[in-house]
């Protein structure tokens, strides 16, 4: 990527909205925008300015220009943001004129990439911006904001510093074996210090994996016998008639999917074929898929009604759910008395009542949110990472530290330990972007939106 050229891109979606924002960033940002201004050319100073834009003596638009002078901008470069009138034609016309005047169309995520390369943000903050933009639920939104602000990133800096301190102590003991006055350099002291760092990394990994799954979507299978209201549950959850709903048993013969974003978790929903005894070959294939999906799912929504809850087909499903996380949903609850509900609650765990045909699924939504309200990740002020490449790096760091601990506890030569510790330290640097390869950085930022 050329860092010395000037780039342009829409910072807002190009549509028929009233106002659009176009960002120009680079050393020639003022020069290029001034080519479109007849009177009162911009000076390189910070401020807001009302100007008319022209191209070949034709008035294009009247705009507001927000000007930032390097290094005091998001990218660390000269930046001019053009608030123009919206509309697909108008916005694209101004962008094309800016390109003809010397700017280049920015790549996806290039503004954030320039900000990173110019030292305005670190890699965790950059990923936080992307997490914030693509957040599907409140948890992911909170993590994105926290990481974007950099408020929790000092945790990685402290881990790096503490690990470097251990590496240095070990190196002193290797280089000067007769010099044993270095405080905290005994095998016991080093082991204790390493265990503290290892524990911190393990907790970061655990929090991050849980948050990643909650933000990306829990694989959720809706299972049960035929005609108990599974498809109605799916339609009510996603507020869309995605699955066919009829009184004919066995209507759903294949897999129907949808997604819902709740407060603490996103669910990837799968409505499965009803499980029952049948001689229909095609329906049996769907039933086999349903049973396989029970094994694969992170969460199972098991739908029954009061008439069939105890029959043999449902007992088979209960058996399949023995080691699974599931919610028992008694649908068609409008047909149940309060006493009947209370008796079922005494007999079965994790039970809720719904009337999906009436879109009454409040109990179910509340229960799912409660199940995935993890205090450690939802109310934590500690660093949580939800980028897959970030989690992979933390896992590699954990493995390096675990190997180092095993080596030091086994009594092997201390210099062997430093090999894994130094690798772990380098991986921590990579996590925040202190050391990086161009291809890796390019790959990360190309996942961003245009204009970020």
Curated annotation (Swiss-Prot):
Give all residue intervals belonging to the TrmE-type G domain: 217-373
Q: Which GO terms describe its cellular component?
A: cytosol
Q: What class of enzyme is it?
A: hydrolase
Q: So which cofactors does this thing need?
A: K(+)
Show the HAMAP family listed in the entry: GTPase_MnmE
* Chain positions recorded as K(+) binding sites: 227, 246, 248, 251
> What is the protein name stated in its UniProt record?
tRNA modification GTPase MnmE
GO terms of molecular function: GTP binding; GTPase activity; metal ion binding
